[in-house]
Amino acid sequence: PIQYALTYPKRVQSPFPRVDFSVRSHLTFEKPDLDTFRCLSLAYCALKTGGTMPAVMNGANEIAVARFLKGELTFLQIPSLIERTMDAYTVKYKYTLEDLLEADAWASAYAQSVRF
């Protein structure tokens, strides 16, 4: 599924054999480096903050990636834009679905307006 997502809309065949999980029954995961993977750190921060912050993080991320794909940002500016958007927002802890949609829309508009 990951390969299909990365090569969408085409379905590129892998030159490697499929992983047989009945044979490879043990996988090891390392703790992620949150300094290197700043967006993951920001996602953890949004979850820890709670309330409407995850919706803000999502909205900012969508705009940051879109702006990167348009050539408006460098890859390394993506987490900076997300962080600036999250820092500018006042979280609601009692919220409705409408509040989540508004938070996402606010973050999208704010992230679109930020200049580097």
Per-region residue spans from a language model:
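Catalytic, metal-anchored helix/loop core of enzyme active sites in primary metabolism
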Residues: 1-116
